[in-house]
Structures are given as structure tokens and as C-alpha cells.
């Protein structure tokens, strides 16, 4: 375990790169409906810090949780896995 403790990581796809040093990443997950036992796809969009502006739309990326960087940014870019 690192000195910062356990930080969550997630995988997603870049859906917007229009901001400076920030990309929007869409993360999909499957949840099971409690009554019908059917799996439903849910998604969330996170603003992610991209220091060098290397991400492009459609890139598959891995993001890691960090301290709050702004009002909406709480994730850092870990790696691009294209």
C-alpha cells in the first residue's frame, strides 16, 4: 500500500477534451436490478486532470482518485491504454 493509502482507480473513455488540462471521462458500470435480476448499464462522467493535454476523444484511459483540484475535479489521469 502506498503512503497515500488506497485510492480508487476506474477505467473509462474520453468524451470531451475541449478544456485546458481537463478531460471528461465516461465510466460505465453494470448494476443488478433488485426485483428483475437484470443487469443494467449505468454511467458516470468525471472531470479528470490531464496535465499535458495528451488525451483525445475516444481514448481509453485509467483514472485515479486524488485530492480536490477544483470545484468538480477529483481525479487524475493515470495512463492511456489505447
Curated annotation (Swiss-Prot):
> Keyword annotations for this protein?
Ribonucleoprotein, Ribosomal protein, RNA-binding, rRNA-binding
One cellular component term from this protein's GO annotations in UniProt: cytosolic small ribosomal subunit
**Taxonomic superkingdom:** Bacteria
Mind listing the GO biological process terms from this record?
translation
Under the heading Gene3D superfamilies, the entry gives: Nucleic acid-binding proteins
Any Pfam family the entry gives? Ribosomal_S17
Q: Name one GO molecular function term.
A: structural constituent of ribosome
What this chain does, per the record? One of the primary rRNA binding proteins, it binds specifically to the 5'-end of 16S ribosomal RNA.
HAMAP family according to UniProt: Ribosomal_uS17_B
Xref: NCBIfam families = PRK05610.1 (NF004123), uS17_bact (TIGR03635)
Name by which UniProt lists this protein: Small ribosomal subunit protein uS17
Q: Which gene encodes it?
A: rpsQ
Amino acid at each position: 500500500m502506498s503512503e497515500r493509502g488506497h485510492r480508487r482507480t476506474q477505467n473509462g473513455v474520453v468524451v470531451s477534451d475541449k478544456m485546458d488540462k481537463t478531460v471528461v471521462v465516461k465510466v460505465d458500470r453494470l448494476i443488478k436490478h433488485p426485483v428483475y435480476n437484470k443487469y443494467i448499464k449505468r454511467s458516470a462522467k468525471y472531470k479528470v486532470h490531464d496535465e499535458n493535454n495528451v488525451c483525445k476523444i475516444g481514448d481509453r484511459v485509467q483514472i485515479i482518485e486524488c485530492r480536490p483540484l477544483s470545484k468538480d475535479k477529483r481525479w487524475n489521469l493515470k495512463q492511456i491504454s489505447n
